[in-house]
From Swiss-Prot:
UniProt function note: Trans-acting transcriptional regulator of RuBisCO genes (rbcL and rbcS) expression.
DNA-binding region listed in the record: 23-42
Organism: Gracilaria tenuistipitata var. liui
Alphabetically ordered keywords of this record: Chloroplast, DNA-binding, Plastid, Transcription, Transcription regulation
Protein name as annotated: Probable RuBisCO transcriptional regulator
One Pfam family, short name: HTH_1
Amino acid sequence: MRDLPFTLDQLRILKAIVKEGSFKRAADSLYVSQPAISLQIQNLEKQLNIPLFERSNKKATLTEAGNLLLRYGGRILALCEETCRALEDVQNLQGGNLVIGASQTTGTYLMPRLIGLFRQRYPQVNVQLQVHSTRLISWSVANGQVDLAVIGGEVPNELKDTLQVTSYAEDELALILPTSHVFSKLPDIQKEDLYRLRFIALDTQSTIRKVIDKILIQHDIDSSRFKIEMELNSIEAIKNAVQSGLGAAFVSVSAIAKELELGILHWAKIENVTIKRMLSIIINPNRYKSKAAETFSKEILTLFVTPAA
């Protein structure tokens, strides 16, 4: 068996340099000196007998060989981390890490409650929550950076053969209005009334907006005719804008529980129209699933949201 021309530490250093963009910042992130970083890279290039970085510019730019080593090195480091976690599982949830991913709305309003309950039951497990777009979270699960995730949209087409997607629960979306709006006095509104409203919306690339547009079309409602007053980048900003009387909006019911209880927002029902999306749990079946992830799936995820029949 041949000796390896690199060490795990050298692979970590290479990854850090690319991530941080320079030798100095990589050294700071690894809590070592810059000369030590440079020496490790010089030794690595000598062992491989090939340059890994372009020496013609100040930025840390990889050569073709450097990119190749980075790609395979990342997989090696991920497998080492996976091995360590598998060994930790021998301790039966007496420690270890659990990284959970979620898309924006789910990660903001549902997952913190579930993670809080899990920590009460298993305080020894270190739980991290990553909240990003459905696309970014899907890639994190595929790459092994996240154990499992709950998302509200579809995984990217290029990952559908990689990820296992399981329907989890229905998430109803509500049309919210200021309590002072004339429509808030009605038991429900008609489809045609939607075209008279001014809307506060997420940007056109958001998962929720795409789902809403798709479902409205199924009910013969053309969302392209809506008067969009403004586009905001967070649900909290949208709720505040609606509460201030700036317009109407569609948001997840899970995001407005407190506001409905306090009576500061109105949930307007549309006659014969119900807008729901399916939340999904995604995992990478080709990667090791820790006992912490298995326990979270079986004990916690089923507690707050009842799956659709």
